Amino acid sequence: MSKTVNVFGKNAIREVLKGSRRVEKIIICDTLNDNEIINLAKTKRIPIQTKNKKAFILEFGDKTGGIVAVVEDYQYIELHELVAKNEDKEDVVFLILDGLEDPHNLGAILRSVDATGCNGVIIPKNRSVKLNETVVKVSTGAIEHVDVSMVTNLNQTISELKEAGYWVYGLELTGSIDYKQANYKGKIAIVVGSEGKGISQLVQKNCDTLIKIPMYGKVNSLNASVSAGIILYEAIRHRG
């Protein structure tokens, strides 16, 4: 039997039910009033289990919205599959996350990725947050529509992307050009680091161009999810 995870939150569960992952069962609190989700689960012939409020909160806590889905664990896409899937497209954007450890940041980034039509996210296996229950909830279901690849070595991955015809940008405060001046046409990958450490020195060296978001206030860095959102929407603007 494949590994399962619990998905919390009405929006996240609604997207799970519309997606392709196998849903083992839905568990609801007897005080829940959401016929849409219940009817959708019944339509897909997914078992529904009801618990009284005390038992439900005891098992799952009080931050679930009164509903939990037991779902097949998220399946990462292999890098070569991600590249092949987008091989015939003229314009492609991959987002590479270097050292991002906050699940709330990753969840928010996945929302921006889905909203902008970004073609995929690449995260390292080590020193990085994984796709967990918090990420799923914060993404409000966006995770169901985004390809995420987990790789062993980011620098090797960047080299492979370059060989496949991708231009790799790194987002850093020390970037040589303003992010609005970058060319987002064709196949590109954009590396975003954590707000604490930024992009590692070796990854910076492997990027083709370092770009920056100008800072006009006293604080010299943005939240990683905000930075990612700004860059992704700029890429879309340039593509018309």
PLM ranges: what are they?
Residues 33, 128-134, 197-203:
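Short, glycine/polar-rich helix-capping loops at beta-to-alpha or helix-loop-helix junctions
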Residues 31, 53-55, 126-128, 195-197, ...:
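Short, acidic/turn-prone active-site loops that include or flank metal/cofactor-
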Residues 169-223:
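Active-site/ligand-binding-proximal alpha/beta "capping" segment
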Residues 18, 46, 84-177:
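RNA substrate-binding interface of SAM-dependent RNA methyltransferases
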Residues 1-84:
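N-terminal positively charged helical leader segments and presequences
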Residues 14, 19-20, 137-140, 201-240:
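Structured adenosyl-cofactor binding patch, chiefly the S-adenosyl-L-methionine
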Residues 59-72, 139-142, 151, 185-193:
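Short basic, glycine-rich beta-strand/loop surfaces that mediate nucleic-acid
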